[in-house]
């Protein structure tokens, strides 16, 4: 149902002497104004070849085109404008959406290729803050979008579960902790112990020595140290999963930093065998000058391996385990240089698949204009933001629809959905400000607006009663045109979102479809008893299907009533 292909096919017999089918297809444009047609073909590039003015070329070409399948084809200066047969177009679009339902837009471009997605990745024993929101929801949406495009996504939560801080945490727990306290409130208690350690070691520097000893024990596999570390990890994960449940997000793997402890020696060995390690001020580095990058630090002067060594081990493990088509890292833009180095070192190691490793960077969130920063003490907990969003949604639902039966469930879907949608409607690399009241509004460019539009469609269908068969799909009302065109575009939008790794493509599309539908609703008598009633209801049903699927691809629920 690619109408651009129909236009290209109509042009091909007259143009194949000069342009390939692909070149014709790529030159076809969608005019900004509908009075200029639904598709337009510019003739500028043919002027050199044919040595004629573009206007003359357009006039001659239009005579050679089979116009039967279009409402009309006309010349406007150097352009040939194509107007689709709106009734036939509408019937085909509605028929396709209604028959395919949630499968509409599904394609097999990915050929079931594996796509590991490194996302979320909070630190054990620390709370999930608003700073973790972006990686978590962008990664989740990308997994849904990649799946819609025929890939097999694997969501990996690469936990921050290793490092010298665990020596400090074990020391603090042994001195001041209790099992009951940790079980009752894992994250807050473990964080409290950690903060206390840093206060006390100002006056008792010997605490640092004890902490170093405990981390050494942990590295050596000491039973008590390992048991405490494992327990801290498990208790933290229980807390994390409560927040992931609220967001409606699951993971395929929680293999974090610790998992790669025994896999880094192989990386160092490969680098040594290939003669890639160079000595620099006592440290071991890989020279990346030919990539215009700083040297990658592999081992410090004391022989300790570094962050990039662990990431190299993880990249190799993922390739061997998943034989991936592409491997994505949804990590903030501030890590761009790190991932450039990672790809370059993998390339130097002789791994051609390094070309399939992609950093998916994103911008920062500010809160009411201020940067979220742990160091300055502005830790804004994600759980609290989600709870506040749900409360705000509940208040608005009570004001709009006080008799709603399942108001608590809907408030959760709207509140949490609002936070996710606000993040994803912004282009990934852009930073944005977060103001909760703006985010949970039912009007404007918000998640609740899209959800409300879809609930409105469901409400119309309930009022119409059971419409099992949409026997008649021909809509002649020009007011339906924008909505029909938006529905037809959904499969292209799904492809574009995957190609650009950009959930905002879906979010902006959903807003556009919702606006087109609401305008149609305001200006049409959908339930009027005439020969086009079933076609209008078919349009409403199609809008409901595609809005629900658009929201699903963002990780947002679509309540039937609001």
From Swiss-Prot:
Broad EC category: ligase
Keywords: Aminoacyl-tRNA synthetase, ATP-binding, Cytoplasm, Ligase, Nucleotide-binding, Protein biosynthesis
CDD domains for the chain: Anticodon_Ia_Arg, ArgRS_core
Family matches, as SUPFAM superfamilies: Anticodon-binding domain of a subclass of class I aminoacyl-tRNA synthetases, Arginyl-tRNA synthetase (ArgRS), N-terminal 'additional' domain, Nucleotidylyl transferase
Gene Ontology molecular functions: arginine-tRNA ligase activity; ATP binding
Ranges spanned by the short sequence motif 'HIGH' region, renumbered to the chain: 122-132
Pfam families on file: Arg_tRNA_synt_N, DALR_1, tRNA-synt_1d
GO BP term, pick one: arginyl-tRNA aminoacylation
Localization: Cytoplasm
Enzyme nomenclature, EC number: 6.1.1.19
Catalytic reaction(s) noted: tRNA(Arg) + L-arginine + ATP = L-arginyl-tRNA(Arg) + AMP + diphosphate
InterPro entries referenced in this protein's UniProt entry, alphabetically: Arg-tRNA-ligase, Arg-tRNA-synth_N, Arg-tRNA-synth_N_sf, ArgRS_core, DALR_anticod-bd, Rossmann-like_a/b/a_fold, tRNAsynth_Ia_anticodon-bd
Assigned GO CC terms: cytoplasm
Record's subunit section: Monomer.
Entry's family note: Belongs to the class-I aminoacyl-tRNA synthetase family.
NCBIfam families for the chain: argS
This protein's name: Arginine--tRNA ligase
Gene (UniProt): argS
């Amino acid at each position: 149902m690619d109408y651009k292909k129909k236009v290209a096919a109509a042009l091909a017999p007259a143009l194949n002497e000069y342009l390939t089918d692909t070149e014709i297809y790529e030159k076809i444009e969608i005019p900004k104004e509908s009075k200029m047609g639904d598709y337009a073909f510019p003739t500028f590039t043919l002027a050199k070849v044919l040595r004629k003015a573009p206007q003359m070329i357009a006039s001659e070409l239009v005579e050679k085109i089979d116009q039967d399948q279009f409402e009309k084809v006309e010349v406007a200066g150097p352009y040939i404008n194509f107007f689709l047969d709106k009734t036939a177009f509408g019937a085909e679009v509605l028929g396709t959406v209604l028959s395919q339902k949630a499968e509409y837009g599904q394609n097999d471009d990915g050929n079931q290729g594996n796509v590991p997605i490194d996302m979320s990745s909070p630190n054990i024993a620390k709370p999930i803050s608003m700073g973790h929101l972006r990686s978590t929801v962008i990664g989740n949406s990308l997994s849904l979008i990649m799946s819609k495009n025929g890939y097999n996504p694997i969501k990996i939560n690469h936990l921050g579960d290793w490092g010298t801080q665990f020596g400090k945490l074990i020391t603090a727990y042994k001195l001041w902790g209790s099992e009951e306290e940790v079980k009752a409130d894992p994250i807050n208690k473990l964080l409290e112990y950690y903060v206390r350690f840093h206060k006390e070691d100002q006056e008792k520097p010997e605490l640092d020595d004890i902490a170093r000893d405990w981390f050494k024990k942990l590295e050596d596999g000491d039973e008590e140290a390992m048991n405490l570390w494992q327990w801290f990890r498990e208790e933290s994960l229980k807390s994390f999963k409560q927040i992931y449940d609220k967001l409606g997000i699951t993971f395929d793997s929680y293999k974090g930093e610790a998992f790669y402890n025994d896999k880094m020696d192989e990386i160092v060995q490969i680098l040594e065998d290939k003669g890639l390690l160079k000595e620099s001020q006592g440290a071991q580095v890989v020279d990346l000058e030919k990539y215009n990058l700083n040297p990658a630090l592999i081992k410090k002067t004391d022989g300790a391996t570094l962050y990039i060594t662990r990431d190299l081990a993880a990249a190799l493990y993922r390739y061997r385990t998943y034989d991936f088509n592409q491997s994505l890292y949804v990590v903030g833009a501030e890590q761009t240089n790190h991932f450039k180095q990672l790809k370059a070192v993998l390339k130097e190691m002789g791994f051609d698949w390094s070309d399939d490793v992609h950093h998916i960077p994103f911008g920062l969130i500010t809160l009411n204009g201020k940067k979220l920063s742990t160091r300055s003490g502005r830790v804004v907990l994600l759980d609290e933001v989600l709870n506040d969003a749900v409360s705000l949604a509940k208040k608005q639902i009570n004001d709009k629809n006080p008799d709603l039966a399942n108001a608590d469930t809907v408030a959760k879907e709207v509140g949490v959905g609002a936070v996710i949608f606000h993040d994803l409607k912004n282009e990934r690399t852009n930073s944005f400000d977060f103001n909760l009241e703006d985010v949970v509004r039912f009007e404007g460019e918000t998640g609740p607006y899209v959800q409300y539009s879809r609930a409105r469609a469901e409400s119309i269908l309930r009022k119409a009663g059971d419409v099992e068969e949409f026997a008649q799909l021909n809509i002649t009302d020009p007011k339906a045109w924008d909505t029909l065109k938006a529905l037809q575009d959904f499969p292209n939008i799904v492809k574009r979102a995957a190609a650009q790794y950009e959930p905002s493509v879906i979010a902006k599309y959903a807003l556009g479809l919702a606006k087109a539908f609401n305008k149609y609703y305001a200006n049409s008598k959908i339930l009027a008893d005439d020969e086009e009633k079933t076609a209008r209801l078919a349009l409403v049903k199609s809008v409901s299907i595609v809005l629900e699927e658009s929201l699903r691809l963002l990780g947002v629920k679509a309540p039937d009533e609001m």
